[in-house]
C-alpha cells in the first residue's frame, strides 16, 4: 500500500512527466540515453575490472597479489583501459551524434547527416587547434578532455546547437537550391548536395569557436565550461556546513550531466594538506586520537557520502534491485552492481536514468547529505577515528572507513549506518517510481507517455510525409 504522502508525490511527479514528455528535446534526451546504455555498460565493466583487478593500486590486485602470479596483469589492464576509452570516454561525442539524430527526426531533417555533423563539431570543439593538429594531439584531446558520461551535457548542448544551426542553414539554402518536384526525384545524391551548405557552416563555426577556446588555455569546450562554473580554492573550507553545500552543488551538476568539484577518484586532492598532517601525526604517535583535522572533505565526503560514486549511488542500486517492480530497472541494477561497488556509477546515471530524471534528482541530492550527517556526528564527538591511511579508490565504499582507520570496528559500523541511511532516502522514491509505472501499465497515463515509457520512440517520431527512402536511417 502507498501512503497519502507517496500518492501525493506520485501525482506531482506524473504531472511533471506529463509536461516534459511533450517536449521534443526531452524525448530526444531519453532516446539518447537509451542508445548510449550498451556502450556505457561495456565501458563501465571494462573500467571496473581493469582498475580493480589488473592495476597496481586496485582493490583485488592488492588483496590477492595478482601481479605476482599473473605477470601480464598490468598489460591486460592497459588494453582494457584503452577499450574503455573508446566507449566511456567517447560518450560525449556519441551523445552529440545521437541527440542531434533524434532531434533531426523530430524536425523532419536528414537525421544521419545532422548526427554526423554534430559529432564532428563536438570533436572539433574538444581539440586544441593551436597546439598543432597531429594524430597524437587529436587522440589525447578526445580521450582526456572530459568526454565521458559525467560531461554528457556538453554533448547534448553541442547536438542541440548543431541541429538548430543546420535547420536554419537548410531553410536559408532552400530558397535558392532546386527542390525535387516529387519525392521520387529525391535521391541520396540530391539530399547530400542540399546538405553541403549547412554542414559547411556548422563545421566552420565549430572551427572558429575551437580556435577561440584554444586561446583561453582550457582543455576544449568541456574544460572551458567546467572552468567557468568551478568554485574558487578558498571556498573549500572544512566546516561541515561548507562540505554539505559543496556536495550539494557537486551533485546538482551531476544530475544535469556535468562533472562537479568532488569525485571518489580525487581523494586527498581537495584537502591534501590536512590529510598529510593527519597522517604525519598518526605515524608519529601511533594513534588516531588527537588528530589536528578530524573533519575534512576526505574524512566526511569521500568516506561516508560517496559510496558507489557521487549521490550514494550504491544505495540506489541496491534499493532498485530489492524494491523496484520494473524488470528493466532491476536488470540495469544488476549490471550496475559490480561497477558501482568499485565506485563507477556511469551505468546508473544513464540506465535508470539519474540524468534529467525528476524522480531521482531529489534523493540523489539528499542521500549524501543524510549519510554524511550520520558519519559526521560520531566523528565530531570523537566516537570514531577519522580516516587517515590511504585506501583503494576501487574498493567498496562501505569498507573505506574500516580500511582507512586500520581496522576500526566502530568506523565500520558507522559506514554501515551511513549506507543504510542513504538507502532509506531512496526507498520512498523507488516506491513512487513503481506507482508511476503501474499507472502506465493500467492506462492511466496519456497514450504518448505510455509509448515513451517503452523507450522505443518509433511511434513518437513523425515519419516524413513521402520519404525518399523508406527506412529510419538515412545514410
Annotate each predicted stretch with a short phrase.
Residues 103-107, 297-304, 316-387, 402-415:
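Hydrophobic alpha-helical bundle architecture
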Residues 58-82, 86-98, 140, 240, ...:
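Interfacial loop/helix-cap signal at membrane boundaries in integral membrane proteins
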Residues 94-99, 246-250, 313-317, 342-350:
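Hydrophobic, membrane-inserted alpha-helices
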Residues 207-226, 231-322:
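Membrane-embedded translocation segments of transport machinery
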Residues 11, 15, 81-86, 330-337, ...:
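Short, amphipathic, aromatic/basic-enriched membrane-interface segments that mark the entry/exit
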Residues 133-140, 240, 283-286, 352-356, ...:
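A cytosolic-side transmembrane-helix exit/cap motif
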Residues 1-41, 46, 52-55, 71-72, ...:
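Signature of multi-pass transmembrane helix bundles
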Residues 58-63, 270-282, 372-396:
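Juxtamembrane non-transmembrane "cap" segments at the membrane-aqueous interface
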